[in-house]
Swiss-Prot record:
InterPro entries: Alkaline_phosphatase_core_sf, DeoB, Metalloenzyme, Phosphopentomutase_DeoB_cap_sf. This is Phosphopentomutase. Belongs to the phosphopentomutase family. It is found in: Cytoplasm. Mn(2+) 1 binds at D10, D323, H324. Gene3D superfamilies: Alkaline Phosphatase, subunit A (3.40.720.10), Phosphopentomutase (3.30.70.1250). Mn(2+) 2 binds at D282, H287, H335. Isomerase that catalyzes the conversion of deoxy-ribose 1-phosphate (dRib-1-P) and ribose 1-phosphate (Rib-1-P) to deoxy-ribose 5-phosphate (dRib-5-P) and ribose 5-phosphate (Rib-5-P), respectively. It comes from the Bacteria. Its main location: cytoplasm.
């Protein structure tokens, strides 16, 4: 019973890509700079799999006998956002980035949105999510108008206090925006950003929801379902793929809930793919430049590795990777264009294999398809022959 378990540590990059300067990301190194800022920092279980052995990795102890195979992957797609990264992991490479709005959205888009939802909006600026609710939260509570904002990524975000606009109504507003944002304005994601609290102490909740574009081509998940496999999704995977190519999914409250749900699915009898996204690294710490918080979240995940390994079956293939960077040590609060780590482990797979620098995240999709015996036109190159 063959299964591939892919765990994406959202934003856990490991050093600037050669084209990082084009994205304003020179010097970004999410994992390396966290270790540099915290001299005694270590991730012993990830290091035992080969984290410190990866070409170009700094700040982590190389293992003399890594349990797994290890490498790093470059992003071939144009962009550095969640959707682009996950689609590429699933074998779909984008040759042009999603549109971004450094000056806010065009007036005609905002007017169409306001007309459709029957109310005015606030904001329409690029901003940090925590800062925008500090700035406009009181006015929102007073007027009832939702807050629209964006970032350096291709996102249309709508923030609303849960007592002012009920969460289900906020989700409906997001669906409306998603239907409007097509063609040249087809942003990667529309995101619901509910918050609670009182003036001066507003706090975002875990009821965030992403409304992604449907993938523009077939992904590993589509091929897997077509071939009769189960595809189980944990976290925001279902949202990222617009629900396509997924047979069962569960949303999560935080990283540790995500690991719990992953373990539950691992204990199920099924053949196919388990795809998990753990978003706290990015959402709670990377974007907020919280080095200590990010480091603690990494340690929390690292402590769960023995549990994950203990629940692997004989034919399971485990892949741990990331979708982009979000270096909390830099001035930027946005994603960074970085290499991502690649750790691969399974009871019947070789240990201590250096997979080198892969030219695309899509090598994961090609390898998983190869392992499951799926014929596909996916991008990427399989490394199965190196590890089996």
């Amino acid at each position: 019973m063959k299964r591939a378990i892919i765990i994406v540590l959202d934003s856990v990059g490991m050093g600037e890509l050669p084209d990082a300067a084009k994205y304003g990301d020179e010097g970004s190194n999410t994992l390396g700079n966290i270790a540099k800022n915290l001299p005694d920092f270590s991730l012993p279980n990830l290091e035992s799999l080969g984290l410190g052995n990866i070409d170009g990795m700094t700040g982590y102890e190389p293992s003399k006998n890594p349990l797994g195979s290890y490498g790093r992957m470059a992003e071939k797609s144009a962009g550095k956002d969640t959707t682009t990264g996950h689609w590429e992991i699933a074998g779909l490479i984008l040759d042009k980035p999603f549109p971004v709005y450094p000056n806010g959205f065009p007036e005609d888009i905002i007017k169409r949105f306001e007309d459709s939802i029957g109310t005015k909006t606030l904001g329409n600026v690029p901003a940090s999510g925590t800062e925008i609710i500090k700035l406009l939260g009181d006015e929102h509570v007073k007027t009832g108008y939702p807050i629209v904002y964006t970032s350096a990524d291709s996102v249309f975000q709508i923030a609303a206090h849960e007592n002012v606009i009920p969460v289900e109504r906020l989700y409906d507003m997001c669906r409306t925006a998603r239907n409007i944002l097509t063609g040249e304005h087809a942003v990667g994601r529309v995101i619901a950003r509910p918050f609670i609290g009182e003036s001066g102490n507003y706090k975002r909740t875990d009821r965030r929801k992403d409304f992604s574009l449907a993938p523009v081509g077939k992904t590993l998940l589509d091929y897997a379902v077509e071939n009769g496999y189960k595809v189980k999704a944990v976290g925001k995977i279902e949202d990222i793929f617009g629900g396509r190519g997924i047979t069962e999914s569960v949303h999560i409250h935080d990283n540790m809930d995500g690991v719990d749900r992953t373990l539950e699915y691992m204990r199920d009898d099924f053949e196919g793919i388990l795809f998990t996204n753990l978003v706290d690294f990015d959402m709670l710490y990377g974007h907020r430049n919280d080095i200590a918080g990010y480091a603690n979240a990494l340690k929390e995940f690292d402590r769960r590795i023995p549990e994950i390994l203990a629940n692997l079956r004989e034919d399971d293939l485990l892949v741990i990777t990331a979708d982009h960077g979000c270096d909390p040590s830099t001035e930027s609060t946005d994603h960074s264009r970085e290499y991502v780590p690649l750790l691969v482990y399974g009871k019947k797979f070789k240990s201590n294999v250096n997979l080198g620098t892969r030219s695309t995240f899509a090598d994961v999709a090609k390898t998983v398809a190869h392992y499951l015996g799926i014929s596909s036109n996916l991008e990427g190159e399989s490394f199965l022959g190196s590890i089996l």
